[in-house]
């Protein structure tokens, strides 16, 4: 057996050991490895502070950031494909006026659906000079386009039942719509979080649609059949980056094999696993929370403070890397 196939098998075994696979249980692969407080986004008291303007908002600062943004944003409905009666609801944000045509960035939501926080990320992407569009990829499954935010439980059930092929179709439709806008350039990238990170990988493996220029996956790995990882990664033609936190055990176990396989395949890839950061570090950042006290968890305030610091450090390194990646691969100076 080749070294690459051994690596692929090792990754598959690690993933199976850390998470239940969908065909064995209804639970999705993204919840089994999360910290207890991240399985559903905890109720966060909103702050009137907007946070660091050079970073996306945290969960706590999202409302203030969205309320005070100087950028134009609106809800749009996009057909899944030409002639389709089904539409995708999406939130599109435009950068402040520019004389140049602007590339597009598709922002793919977590398993929690198109939340206010994802809209906040899209706003920050637009602040960096791109047209940002965040689709609600479960629009069809929820009964049609809606501006209402789903509950975390409802969103999780819908996202985990959406096939990869439909995700790719939805992203392609959204990208084509955004690139058709008068101010848009015919190039796009994808960034995604958790479930959206996996979706970003699969869109990259699938090849995207005309104009696809690369993807950034935050704490998400490829979803492939056991033993098929190497063949899937071999299909990649565009740059991709993976950013995760060391407390995300499943992705941490998979990353060394992905790194080695992508290097051996001579693909443009960068991966970083931030020490002490959690799954969902970009949403959490340094938002305050109480120590968790359960039968299996006995946190101290010092533990919480260390985690908050690690999450913020990961965000301060990971977001500039993301912006640099987008500008380089979308041809923005």
Where are the regions a protein language model picked out?
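Short alpha-helix in the alpha/beta-hydrolase fold that links the catalytic acid
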Residues: 121, 228-229, 252-262
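C-terminal motif of bacterial Sec signal peptides marking the signal peptidase cleavage site
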Residues: 15-18
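Acidic catalytic loop of the alpha/beta-hydrolase fold
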Residues: 246-251
